[in-house]
Each structure stands twice: as structure tokens, then as C-alpha cells.
A protein has these predicted regions:
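Extreme N-terminal starter segment of soluble prokaryotic enzymes
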Residues: 1-4
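Short Gly/Thr/Asp-enriched flexible loops that form oxyanion-binding sites at enzyme active sites
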Residues: 16-20, 198-211
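Electropositive, gly/pro-rich neighborhoods at or near active sites that engage anionic ligands
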Residues: 21, 31-166
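A short helix->loop->beta-strand "cap" motif at the edges of active sites that frequently abuts
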Residues: 24-25, 214-218, 277
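Short internal beta-strands
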Residues: 28-32, 217-224, 260-266
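Active-site glycine-rich loop that binds ribose-phosphate moieties when present
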Residues: 162-182
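Redox- and metal-dependent alpha/beta enzyme cores, enriched for Fe-S-associated oxidoreductases
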Residues: 203-241
């Protein structure tokens, strides 16, 4: 069974690991690059790296970065008085150095990611949504616009999100294989990532939304538990952008795209407020591979 997952960071990465663990599933993961940013002149792809590290089984204890990493370089950057808010572990830094060197030589992000997957012995294809520069920008009070990492890391998601824009998206094209994977899939799954901040940037790349909307079988997994995000500001961002509360807001965020929505059993009352899509209530907490695989089987009916 060919499956495509649209993924942001930790939640989507954990679901990807569960999908990849099912022998009957031939998985391709398409990942958000709206969070990508330059840090100390290095190209950082947070969501791509989180997905790769998780599939390789080397992700950090919080779901991002590398397991048992050290931070000697960061300590030395502090010595020189450099802005060190966005911390990168030493092992993680090595990947950023490799990617940045390849990009300076003109290699596309998708090609570099294939090489990184081979270094970590990951067989699952992981594709950036685009090789072009697309950046999520956050509109806040006072008509000020922030880069994603400024909002998320430096300002700790404290600003109310008034608007979003995806700079460069209108001129971008899908990375090689992205639309083909969606068109050839038996099912498309939208992972339990933040809908506006992690999935909308993928859909903003011309051709991807259209391919998903045309697909006969698209399921989304809600990132909410008891109406709240387990991690991150998903519930607050959806509310401040005018989406309805709870899983009704998740369904509206994907209006015209999904056939079914998978919600946690704690939110089963939301099923009465959602029209037009099939609702499945199941335990959606995926802390390990086994629970992620069980959720994946339920989504796919395996």
C-alpha cells in the first residue's frame, strides 16, 4: 500500500516512524520547509532533520535534535558573545555544515536529503515540499512580521498570531517526486502537526494543494488532546487566526482536502460539531513506535 504523509516536526515524524514500521506500507514523507532558516550562516531545516532523525532512531529525548548530543560549540559561541538562542548540538551541527556546503555548491535540498538518508541507513523516501526558498512569516500586533524561528524560538511563541504568509511560495515548484508520490499513493495522511504553521506551508507550494484535493483518500490526524496541543501553540494559533475551537478548527483548516479526521478519544464530543468528514476517535498519543504503528493501522484500516 503506497502512503504519502505530509509532515511537520515531532508529531508528524513520530507518525512517520509508525507508518514505516508496517510491512504492508510503502511510505513517502513530504516535509515542511517553511521553518528553514540561516543560523550562523548554516542552512537549518528543523522539520526535515526531525523526520530523518526519528526514522533513523537517533532523535533527541524531546523529539528533536540528536540523542546524547553535546553542546561544546554552543558553549564556545557564548564565549564570543554570539547570539546562541537557537542551540544546535555538535552532532546536529555536523549535518548542518554538510548541508550548507552542498547548497553552496548548488545542490538542491531534495538531493542533499537523499544523501543524508543514506548516511543514516533510512530507506523511506523523505522529500522537502520544495527545493525553492519558502519561508513562513508570522504577522503580529502592530503590522509587524516575524520569521518563524524568531517567533518560535527567540520569542517563545508568546505573540498572538494575527496572520500568516509564505514568502516565496508563489514562485516555488514542488520538489522532484512530490506530486508524483501524491498522485500515485493509495492514501494520503496529514500528520498530527500544527495545521497553519506546519502543513499550510506545504500546501502553499503550487501544485501540492491541488494534488491533495484531487486525491480520493485523504485522512488527517489531529494534533489536539482534550482540545489543546500536547506541544507547541497549535490550538492558540488556530484560534487567533479565526478558526473554530477544538477539532472543528482542525477540520476547517483542511476544508476541501480531507475525507476523514482522526481525533483522540478525549475529544470524542467534537464529533458532533464536525460535518462533511468521517470522524474516527482513537488513542492518538504516539510516544513509541508500537503506539504509532497501531494508530497508523487504524488510519489505514489495516
Amino acid at each position: 500500500m503506497k502512503v504519502v504523509e505530509l509532515s511537520g516536526g515531532v508529531g508528524g515524524a513520530r507518525l512517520a516512524r509508525g507508518l514505516a514500521a508496517i510491512a504492508a506500507v510503502d511510505l513517502t514523507v513530504i516535509v515542511n520547509v517553511g521553518d528553514d532558516e540561516s543560523n550562523h550562516d548554516l542552512h537549518v531545516s528543523p522539520d526535515l532533520d526531525t523526520v530523518v532523525y526519528t526514522l533513523a532512531g537517533v532523535e533527541g529525548e524531546h523529539g528533536w535534535g540528536r540523542r546524547q548530543d553535546t553542546f561544546v560549540t554552543n558553549e564556545e559561541l557564548d564565549r564570543f558573545g554570539l547570539d546562541n538562542t537557537f542551540q544546535l548540538g555538535d552532532k546536529d551541527l555536523a549535518l548542518k555544515l554538510y548541508r550548507s556546503q552542498r547548497m553552496r555548491l548548488g545542490d538542491p535540498l531534495s538531493e542533499i536529503t537523499r544523501s543524508v538518508l543514506s548516511f543514516f541507513a533510512v530507506d523511506t523516501p523523505v522529500l522537502p515540499a520544495t527545493d525553492d526558498r519558502v519561508r513562513t512569516e508570522i504577522g503580529i500586533e502592530g503590522n509587524e512580521w516575524l520569521s518563524f524561528q524568531n517567533y518560535f524560538v527567540h520569542r517563545q511563541q508568546e505573540d498572538e498570531v494575527r496572520a500568516l504568509r509564505f514568502e516565496g511560495a508563489d514562485k516555488s515548484v514542488p520538489a522532484p517526486g512530490v506530486v508524483e508520490a501524491i498522485n500515485g499513493a493509495d492514501a494520503v495522511v496529514i500528520g498530527p502537526s500544527n495545521p497553519p504553521l506546519s502543513i499550510w506551508p506545504i500546501l502553499a507550494v503550487p501544485g501540492i494543494r491541488e494534488a491533495v484535493a484531487a486525491h480520493r483518500r485523504v485522512a488527517a490526524v489531529s494534533p489536539l488532546f482534550g482540545g489543546k496541543a500536547l506541544k507547541g501553540p497549535a490550538d492558540r494559533v488556530m484560534a487567533s487566526l479565526g478558526l473554530p475551537p477544538g477539532n472543528e478548527g482542525v477540520a476547517e483548516a483542511y476544508l476541501g482536502l480531507i475525507d476523514s479526521l482522526v481525533i483522540d478519544t478525549a475529544d470524542i464530543a467534537d464529533a458532533d460539531t464536525i460535518a462533511g468528514v468521517e470522524i474516527t476517535a482513537i488513542d492518538t498519543l504516539i510516544g513509541d513506535t508500537e503506539s504509532a504503528a497501531a494508530l497508523s493501522r487504524a488510519i489505514l484500516g489495516l
